[in-house]
């Protein structure tokens, strides 16, 4: 079982992560989202408020959990995100893969609305920088996270 560091950008310290059902679903449905990319978490924290915080967690995988992993943007990834953003609730404990960031999200929404084709979507996103997200969708999954520290990114 490997131990890796994950980051969560927020406007508050999150010692005890929770899964919250909100008005809008995210790429992989409702869950607690982290990334293995510190700079990405920093951007999430910085844009959320004047008091941005990057929370740092150690993550130890659990082979008993149901995990879905997308190594890159694929048709399956696109279809899964489309379903989740439309309200689909899956039974995975953890989902990991690329993130539909703000730019990609606009292309995704145009694809879902039928304004562009699947081929056009892939053409538009193929040169975008890599992103990463890992989302936790059950209490068993959240038990894989251990809060290490938080860092304020702006004052």
Task: Set out the residue ranges of the language-model regions.
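Extended catalytic/binding region for NAD+/ADP-ribose chemistry, centered on the ART fold
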Residues: 23-48
């Amino acid at each position: 079982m490997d131990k890796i560091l994950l980051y969560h950008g927020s406007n508050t310290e999150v010692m005890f992560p929770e899964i919250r059902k909100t008005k809008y679903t995210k790429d992989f449905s409702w869950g607690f989202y982290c990334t293995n990319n510190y700079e990405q978490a920093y951007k999430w924290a910085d844009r959320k408020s004047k008091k941005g915080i990057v929370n740092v967690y150690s993550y130890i995988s659990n082979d008993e959990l149901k995990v879905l992993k997308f190594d890159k943007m694929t048709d399956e990834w696109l279809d899964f995100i489309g379903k989740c953003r439309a309200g689909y609730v899956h039974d995975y404990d953890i989902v990991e893969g690329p993130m539909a960031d703000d730019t990609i999200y606009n292309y995704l929404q145009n694809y879902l609305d039928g304004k562009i084709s699947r081929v056009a979507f892939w053409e538009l996103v193929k040169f975008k920088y890599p992103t990463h997200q890992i989302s936790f969708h059950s209490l068993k999954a959240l038990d894989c996270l251990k809060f290490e520290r938080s860092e304020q990114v702006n004052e």
